[in-house]
Amino acid sequence: MIEVVAELSRGPVFLAGEALECVVTVTNPLPPTATSASSEALAWASAQIHCQFHASESRVALPPPDSSQPDVQPDSQTVFLPHRGERGQCILSTPPKILFCDLRLDPGESKSYSYSEVLPTEGPPSFRGQSVKYVYKLTIGCQRVNSPITLLRVPLRVLVLTGLQDVHFPQDEAVAPSSPFLEEDDSGKKDSWLAELAGERLMAATSCRSLHLYNISDGRGKVGTFGIFKSVYRLGEDVVGTLNLGEGTVACLQFSVSLQTEERVQPEYQRRRGTGVAPSVSHVTHARHQESCLHTTRTSFSLPIPLCSTPGFCTAIVSLKWRLHFEFVTSREPGLVLLPPLEQPEPATWTGPEQVPVDTFSWDLPIKVLPTSPTLVSYAAPGPSTSSITI
């Protein structure tokens, strides 16, 4: 029996363009009750990163597969296919790297191997929606002699920051070590430089604050004014807004605001049913605030953006956008007053009206959500960093 353990050194969350580092440990455990044990051998082990794409058949109409592409023996158990047995299709993969060949371990012996690969920047982010799913995995394949291949899959989460794929790593003294006697690995230097560049771009895009005011009106007049200080956010930030109802001419009885994502299938991939079109848009609510606001002149709200959510993106098949969805309940009666008089000549009982004629309307405000530091996401929303399998 051989135990294979794969451990991600920095957690399972990465930014596209970063280098993934994984330590693969192969052990021939010594049974505590065994009186004798024999050595174990593996013919080889290889590792590869791939992105698996799956679409809902009821929502997405995909074109037929290209028959001109060669088939690499998908049914053979001796061919290393990292996506073997998974639903959907592999849309992105890195070149496979061999970890070792002809490994023999004595009882109780263990050996470790380091795997490093740069995550492609041309792929989509990790996403699990109602119409499509993009799932990244690191797959390690091991094989004994004259035996089928055994696959160990390590789930990954990949965040994509648009524009980094067009940036080239500088090869001048600007990124050279400060001391000529200190050597730094090129891959580590490039990885840290890319992380710093991504952090600078995210900070520049989300730190700009400027008050934006929006007049909210229905068909009968002004309801209020909504104010927000910025429209670009990072994962983990709070969306803060204010609502001024004191200037309105239409009484607002209640309002709610929801932080939502809108997943939309591109028109050319929408599933058509007879003469109609299948649902191509789905909404997910991540946070919500509701308030009864009669006689309220000014109020505010704060909606957190979950770290486990996906920033906005767009591919040839689907797009994901963020928005604030408002719903207002207003009174049809002009000058509605539901407070008791200040002076009562004699004792009286005051009750609110049993029925109030109302109107409802909604309003959507688009916002932009960008990724954040992968290290922050790993700490705040931890996922499994270690996977193991027994051969």
From Swiss-Prot:
Any single Gene Ontology cellular-component annotation: membrane
Assigned protein family: Belongs to the RGP1 family.
Keywords on record: Cytoplasm, Guanine-nucleotide releasing factor, Membrane
Function according to Swiss-Prot or TrEMBL: The RIC1-RGP1 complex acts as a guanine nucleotide exchange factor (GEF), which activates RAB6A by exchanging bound GDP for free GTP and may thereby required for efficient fusion of endosome-derived vesicles with the Golgi compartment. The RIC1-RGP1 complex participates in the recycling of mannose-6-phosphate receptors.
Record PANTHER family: REDUCED GROWTH PHENOTYPE 1 RGP1, YEAST -RELATED
GO molecular function: guanyl-nucleotide exchange factor activity; small GTPase binding
Keyword Membrane recorded: yes
Compartments (UniProt record): Cytoplasm, Cytosol; Membrane
Keyword check for rRNA-binding: no
One GO biological process term: negative regulation of protein catabolic process
Species name: Mus musculus (Mouse)
Disulfide bonds: none
Protein name (Swiss-Prot/TrEMBL): RAB6A-GEF complex partner protein 2
Subunit structure: Forms a complex with RIC1; the interaction enhances RAB6A GTPase activity. Interacts with RIC1. Interacts with RAB6A; the interaction is direct with a preference for RAB6A-GDP. Interacts with RAB33B.
Record InterPro entries: Rgp1 (IPR014848)
